[in-house]
């Protein structure tokens, strides 16, 4: 990293209280970006003040907020900022973050935003290829079910669109739903049941494998996705692996950051 440069990339994540997943996902994305852009200084910020507070109290581990990271950049003499979120969609969390960053626009010469993971149909196709590559040994008789987070923002329609795209790209045994909104688990159980798989793999469609993955997806509660599929009569295997562990997904964030840098020229 060039300590003398006045150019920086701020990698913004929601955050996670799960150390192992943080190291395997968020930190891997940050490292890939650091390796790709050695003429930029790399900064980190998380948007979840709740998780930041937990880590500070529990582990004495400090993560800056977006505001704190921007203030540090000003102190360090940064003039050009690329903000690369590790969010999946350009939804509520991402929009709040962008507003916060833009409140500092007078403090920098240039600010550009990289897009979240899924910004257009090309991203969707690339993401599908990245995740299906990781499950290339999935048998035709088996089903792969992704748990997305979901949002009340209108971009939530991306999940239903992704599910359809999986089917259109010769992956009829791949399904995706969300934990917060539609497509919901009860709809997924019906859809997967009609497929009659010999085995179901359930894994998060989230950057980190955190609380949702460990509890809502793979927990012992009757409401967990694993339990609901088991109650429907299926053999279920949870895979606690965040999207940030997939090289193809991390590569997409690097590409999005590059596009943002190019837009500043």
What label would you give each PLM region?
Residues 1-265:
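Active-site-proximal alpha-helix that buttresses catalytic centers in soluble enzyme cores
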């Amino acid at each position: 990293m060039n300590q003398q440069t006045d150019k920086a990339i701020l990698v913004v994540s929601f955050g996670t209280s799960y150390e192992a997943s943080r190291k395997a996902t968020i930190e891997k994305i940050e490292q890939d970006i650091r390796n790709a852009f050695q003429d930029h200084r790399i900064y980190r910020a998380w948007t979840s003040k709740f998780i930041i507070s937990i880590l500070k109290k529990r582990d004495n581990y400090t993560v800056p907020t977006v505001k704190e990271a921007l203030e540090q950049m000003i102190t360090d003499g940064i003039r050009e900022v690329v903000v690369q979120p590790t969010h999946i969609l350009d939804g509520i969390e991402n929009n709040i973050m962008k507003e916060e960053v833009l409140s500092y626009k007078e403090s920098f010469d240039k600010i550009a935003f990289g897009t979240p993971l899924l910004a257009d149909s090309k991203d969707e196709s690339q993401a599908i290829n990245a995740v299906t590559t990781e499950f290339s040994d999935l048998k035709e008789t088996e089903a792969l079910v992704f748990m997305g987070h979901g949002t009340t923002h209108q971009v939530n329609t991306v999940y239903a669109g992704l599910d359809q795209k999986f089917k259109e790209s010769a992956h009829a045994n791949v399904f995706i739903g969300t934990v917060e909104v539609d497509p919901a688990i009860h709809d997924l159980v019906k859809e997967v049941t009609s497929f009659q798989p010999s085995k179901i793999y359930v894994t998060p469609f989230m950057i980190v494998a955190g609380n949702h993955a460990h509890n809502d997806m793979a927990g012992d509660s009757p409401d967990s996705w694993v339990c609901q599929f088991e109650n429907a009569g299926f053999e279920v295997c949870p895979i606690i692996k965040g999207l940030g562990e997939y090289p193809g997904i991390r590569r997409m964030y690097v590409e999005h950051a590059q596009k943002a840098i190019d837009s500043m020229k």
